[in-house]
Amino acid sequence: MKRKLYWLQILFISVLAFSCNKYLNVVPDNIPTLDNAFTSRSEAEKYLATCYSFLDNEGDPGVNVAYLAGDEFWLKYPQPTGSSTNWNIARGGQSVVNPIAGIWGDKYKGIRVCNTFLENISDTTKVRDLSIDERTRWTGEAMFLKAYYHFLLFRQYGAIPIVDKNLPINAPLAQTKVKRQPVDSVVNYIADLMDSASKKLLNNVINPSTDYGHITKPIALSMRAKVLVYGASPLFNGNKDYANFKNRDGQLLIDPDFDISKWKKAADAAKEAIDVCKSAGIYMYTFINTTGYPLSDITMTQMSIRNAMCEPWNQEIIWGNSSTSTWGLQYSSMAHIDPNNAGNTAIGPTLGPTMNVVEQFYTKNGVPISEDKTLDFSNISQLRTATHEERFNLIENYQSARINFDREPRFYADLGFDGGVWYMQNSPSHTDEDTWNLKCRLGQFGATNGNTVTTYYPKKVVNWKFVFNSDNTMYLLDYPFPTMRLADLYLLYAEAMNEAYGPSDEVYKYLNIIRDRAGIPTVQESWTNYSKNPSEYTTQSGLRAIVHDERNNEMAFEGSRFWDLRRWKIAAQVLNGNIVGWDANGTADNPESFYKLTTYFTMHFVAPRDYLWPLAEGDLQVNENLVQNPGW
């Protein structure tokens, strides 16, 4: 009962934090009847809010399938509490009978609601008290949402039926049994609709105090670029595995022939979006120290990385999903870093970043740990004692594993670990000279109320103003989930440019903007001076690997890795392996027992089956024109 009260307390705080966005959080008890929905501006606005209500709660790790269905996080097994259904996908439990995290029915319902709104709002005899400008903007918002829901379906299922208009209620039964449309047609439809929507939208919301979360032109064009990148990626562009994937009438659903023009179109779209974002005042976030206390350059860099995700409505956010709450994500990620409050049972650390992610981050020289010719990571569990010079990243004079030393700033910004420093706003001295840290071997304060299974923590997702106390209370600053931020768009552009034209100064430019904020040298400097493969960045395949790594590192814990591994068509290589971490049963007086690589699970990814979701058997039985995805 106590824990339920704590959760309610957090939810109350979340509501306060998002009071300015209450419009997007107001969903009518029932979808308004058409008799009343378009009689006035206020009623039409409620219907528009219903269009928004089908956006996913991306900040909830139990809802956002990208958090638990891949290899980025792992949970303790069995899970005593909480929603971990999506984790069953990672454990091989997907099914055609009742597909886990299926969105087929929900998103098509959202599309139908958007269609109804668009059909009625276009009739100028309705909603007579609505201004022309507002009618235009609302039309653009609903058009985008309709396109976005199609994108979510495409991303998950591949070829899908396009529902451009609602069928009349008396439509013949045969007309309702729609078939799936080819992926190229789906991608072009979504991209064109988003482009049309963008022409009706403004660069910025008119009133930030009430309108944040509304769709704007930068959102529409940035998501259009992402859609086109997905359509150009190997899963859907030149994938021979789908050469025989056809509708019952023989129509090919995924073209097995590679088409480079798709990458060129994606690159053009990304550049257009970048230019619009610039004109809208969207730029890379940099932390400004307003604490009144000195902070080292090392901590300042880490705070720029952390707050790019967690600072509400910061200047890098293109689309912040204010329909979501991140309290569950933060609660599940926060470590017991304050020894005075180690007994706080309201903290429930469950999300454990895997060794796949830990090893993914670069060295301090900006190259993969396997490529750095100046640093030896052959024995990642070897014990090493942190020095005074390393005190802003690791606990001085404390032993930790080799893998936790000499890493890039994003490693220390994104991950909490045994022996690591964890700066927060309420740090004891308010400086980073005397700040919180994490000691989480058995018998230490960090493990008082349990560890994550891997003993790593996703520090990045926890807002630096999170506070918890000895009396089991906490203060949590919620933030809109960053569905799209500028770094994401820059990476999409760099990827598309390399795939379309090969290595160029333009690709390096946008990669290096991100690397500069991350506190590492340029691509050229890092590979020339530190890599065992100094010319890697000069070839298209080599630069592709660098772009992939850069994306995994920059977008860690934001729900990108799960989908990127699939669209790059490398999930079968990455997700057929062991889930590894340290031994959480290792004790404080025996660090060797803690730093023992432990396998928790062996994943089995079956290609091509697991690249796409299965359609539910029930849907196939109702509509015989639908065909199942290959392998299911």
Map each language-model feature to its residues.
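Bacterial Sec-dependent N-terminal signal peptides
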Residues: 1-29
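Long, intrinsically disordered, low-complexity segments
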Residues: 19-20, 107-110, 189-191, 267, ...
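Acidic, glycine-rich segments characteristic of secretory precursors and extracytoplasmic regions
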Residues: 20-70, 116, 123, 133-139, ...
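Conserved, well-structured interaction surfaces
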Residues: 45-61, 79-157, 173-217, 381, ...
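Extended amphipathic alpha-helical segments enriched in small hydrophobics
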Residues: 146-147, 224-228, 480-521
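Short coil/turn linking the two alpha-helices of tandem helical-hairpin repeats
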Residues: 154-155, 159-161, 227-239, 499-502
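Short coil/linker segments at helix-helix boundaries
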Residues: 160-180, 235-265
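Flexible, polar/acidic helix-loop-strand segments at domain edges
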Residues: 336, 355-356, 362-371, 375-485
